């Protein structure tokens, strides 16, 4: 019985997670929507940055010691975290490999405040 549970758990973990589009990107150009939908967590490359999180603009950031601190600068479709909130970003949640076509820093934060990904502001 334990082997079945272990096998089932491993099989489910191997399935790529799909990003959640709650309509927050429908006004965006197709290329930007696709970028959001395919953005994967740096430490879990089969799990979407936004599968269980909400995206916030974080155009400002600071470096404190050895990690980034993202600063919420605007809301997207959600407004749970107030503008100006400083969010410490663990180094393993920094997303460097997918570019950033939005021109904005984007941080994905879960309902319990956990950071899934942070993409620093980039050029369009």
What is each residue range found by the language model?
Residues 20-71:
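N-terminal secretory signal peptides
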Residues 7, 42-43, 110:
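Residue-level signal for mature regions of secreted extracellular proteins and peptides
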Residues 10-11:
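Short, linear, compositionally biased motifs with a strong N-terminal bias
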Residues 14-16:
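N-terminal signal peptide c-region/cleavage motif recognized by signal peptidases
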Residues 67-77, 114-119:
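Generic recognition of long tandem-repeat/solenoid scaffolds
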Residues 96-124:
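C-terminal partner/receptor-binding element of secreted or periplasmic proteins
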């Amino acid at each position: 019985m334990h082997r079945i549970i272990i096998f089932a758990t491993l099989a489910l973990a191997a399935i790529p997670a799909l990003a959640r589009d709650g309509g927050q990107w429908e006004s965006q150009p197709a290329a930007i929507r696709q970028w959001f939908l395919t953005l994967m967590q740096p430490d879990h490359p089969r799990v979407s940055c936004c599968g269980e999180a909400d995206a916030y603009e974080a155009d400002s950031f600071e470096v404190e010691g050895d990690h980034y601190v993202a600063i919420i600068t605007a809301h997207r479709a959600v407004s749970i975290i107030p503008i100006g909130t400083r969010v410490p970003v663990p180094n393993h949640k920094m997303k460097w490999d997918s570019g950033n076509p939005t021109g904005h820093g984007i941080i994905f934060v879960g309902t319990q405040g956990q950071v899934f990904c942070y993409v620093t502001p980039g050029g369009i």
